[in-house]
């Protein structure tokens, strides 16, 4: 039987990571958090004072970066950066870094390599359109901006990050704009993807819906 690839795309705060993790656990699939990969690259560039427009320096940097993911733990050159990659400065810059072609090309290759010969579920912005256009299940999660901001704000509160709801909403809308208008792999629904509005759905509702789609292709 062919390996199953499940692609979950959607804007920031639509519930992609939460849902993807739970689905992976339910079906014993490998979960690949592509957003965390871009966050780790963003962290490296910021901490090494590399300008996002300096493509030569970025290309050099990519050769010195080793990413490792173990469950909810993320390692950048063997250092646990799981908390750091969720900081406000990363949120404000990750969409800019994700729009850089050499960064995208590098990470798309890595995502395909990790997924080779496995049943995987990936979440991101361009999984169903660019990374795995032949994925057997493609879901595009959406939700009202205010609801997505509320979810993100609650996540920040749990992590004791000092930020206001209005700041979260503003940042999220800015990311939506950058993600959907960027030249490289813009955020858009794949033609065959099923769009699911999670604004008024529970996590269980969403998992049940996607699970049925996976069962059909198993």
From Swiss-Prot:
Pfam families membership: Cytidylate_kin (PF02224)
GO MF entry, a single one: dCMP kinase activity
Keywords annotated in UniProt: ATP-binding, Cytoplasm, Kinase, Nucleotide-binding, Transferase
Catalytically driven reaction(s): CMP + ATP = CDP + ADP; dCMP + ATP = dCDP + ADP
Family named by the database record: Belongs to the cytidylate kinase family. Type 1 subfamily.
PANTHER family listed in its UniProt record: CYTIDYLATE KINASE, CYTIDYLATE KINASE/PANTOATE-BETA-ALANINE LIGASE
Xref: NCBIfam families: cmk
Name of the protein in question: Cytidylate kinase
Species lineage: Bacteria, Fusobacteriati, Fusobacteriota, Fusobacteriia, Fusobacteriales
């Amino acid at each position: 039987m062919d390996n199953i690839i499940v692609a979950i795309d959607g804007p920031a705060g639509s519930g992609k990571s939460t849902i993807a993790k739970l689905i992976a656990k339910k079906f014993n699939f490998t979960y690949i958090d592509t957003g965390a990969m871009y966050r780790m690259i963003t962290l490296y560039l910021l901490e090494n004072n590399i300008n996002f427009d300096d493509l030569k320096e970025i290309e050099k940097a990519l050769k010195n970066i080793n990413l490792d993911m173990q469950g909810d733990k993320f390692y950048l050159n063997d250092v646990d950066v799981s908390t750091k990659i969720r900081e406000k400065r990363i949120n404000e810059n990750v969409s800019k870094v994700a729009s850089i072609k050499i960064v995208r090309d590098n990470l798309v290759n890595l995502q395909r390599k990790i997924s080779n010969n496995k049943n995987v579920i990936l979440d991101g912005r361009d999984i169903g359109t660019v990374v795995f256009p032949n994925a057997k299940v493609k879901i595009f999660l959406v939700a009202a901006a205010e609801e997505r901001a509320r979810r993100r704000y609650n996540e920040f509160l749990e992590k004791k990050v000092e930020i206001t709801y209005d700041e979260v909403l503003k940042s999220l809308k800015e990311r939506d704009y950058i993600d959907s208008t960027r030249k490289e792999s813009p955020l858009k629904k794949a033609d065959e993807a099923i769009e699911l509005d999670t604004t008024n759905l529970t996590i269980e509702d969403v998992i049940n819906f996607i699970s049925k789609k996976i069962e059909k292709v198993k």
